[in-house]
Amino acid sequence: MSEGTPNSTHFGYKTVESDQKADMVAGVFHSVAAKYDIMNDVMSFGIHRMWKRFTIESAGARPGMKVLDLAGGTGDLTAKFSHIVGDKGQVTLADINDSMLKVGREKLRDKGIVGNVNYVQANAEALPFPDNHFDIITIAFGLRNVTDKDAAIRSMLRVLKPGGKLLVLEFSKPKHDVMRKVYDLYSFKVMPKMGALITQDAESYEYLAESIRMHPDQETLKGMMVDAGFEQVEYTNMTDGIVALHKGYKF
């Protein structure tokens, strides 16, 4: 999917200046942060938990590892990784949006998840971490909101250790026509109404639906990861391709 001209990009279906998108996306997530977890459960009928569980299982994390949960938001994956890597490991929850980080930090601390988790406000396109630092990086439902996806993927490659794994969990393209039609109807007619009802913000959920449609499809994203330098790149479709999990290694 085209990212626009060199100085422009997509914000949903709109074309905007590249340097404006980050602030516009930030506005969306500042607006929805407090109700983000509730909306995830309502909009996906709870299925997002199954998608995330599969991602955790596919990551193959072990005690003592360093994990980066990028665009980690309210910390669903961080919570699971924290238990897996244990006291000798470390999980970094990074997000560009301070409102999402605040919600995630408070939620995990309320659950008693402290000690091996740290929180960093970071832009995926220029990660503030040393080279060859993490064993595993996950980015769940975040890549589509990044202005320069290619730069972000290269940045993730840089901070992975040799032998490390990147997992990208993201909305993608349904494989069958019937599912595509149902999904479009749900995304553009139902989601904004639920957003208005629960968060009093239909516009943000209109953007989220549009951003999903503008995101690269399964094969395009696979090619982007290969072009960045990842090896053994593959993906698994879930729920008929509504969501796909891409995996790639750094060697």
From Swiss-Prot:
MF (Gene Ontology): 2-methoxy-6-polyprenyl-1,4-benzoquinol methyltransferase activity; demethylmenaquinone methyltransferase activity
InterPro entries membership: SAM-dependent_MTases_sf, UbiE/COQ5_MeTrFase, UbiE/COQ5_MeTrFase_CS
Keywords of the record: Menaquinone biosynthesis, Methyltransferase, S-adenosyl-L-methionine, Transferase, Ubiquinone biosynthesis
Spans traversing the lipid bilayer: none
Catalysis: reaction(s): a 2-demethylmenaquinol + S-adenosyl-L-methionine = a menaquinol + S-adenosyl-L-homocysteine + H(+); a 2-methoxy-6-(all-trans-polyprenyl)benzene-1,4-diol + S-adenosyl-L-methionine = a 5-methoxy-2-methyl-3-(all-trans-polyprenyl)benzene-1,4-diol + S-adenosyl-L-homocysteine + H(+)
S-adenosyl-L-methionine found in the keyword field: yes
SUPFAM superfamilies in UniProt: S-adenosyl-L-methionine-dependent methyltransferases (SSF53335)
GO BP annotation list: aerobic respiration; menaquinone biosynthetic process; methylation
Pathway noted in the entry: Quinol/quinone metabolism; menaquinone biosynthesis; menaquinol from 1,4-dihydroxy-2-naphthoate: step 2/2; Cofactor biosynthesis; ubiquinone biosynthesis
A Pfam family that the UniProt record links to this protein: Ubie_methyltran
Enzyme Commission code(s) on record: 2.1.1.163, 2.1.1.201
Gene3D superfamilies named among the record's database cross-references: Vaccinia Virus protein VP39
Binding site for S-adenosyl-L-methionine: T74, D95, N123, A124
Enzyme class label: transferase
Record function comment: Methyltransferase required for the conversion of demethylmenaquinol (DMKH2) to menaquinol (MKH2) and the conversion of 2-polyprenyl-6-methoxy-1,4-benzoquinol (DDMQH2) to 2-polyprenyl-3-methyl-6-methoxy-1,4-benzoquinol (DMQH2).
Similarity remark: Belongs to the class I-like SAM-binding methyltransferase superfamily. MenG/UbiE family.
Name the UniProt record assigns to this protein: Ubiquinone/menaquinone biosynthesis C-methyltransferase UbiE
Organism: Shewanella woodyi (strain ATCC 51908 / MS32)
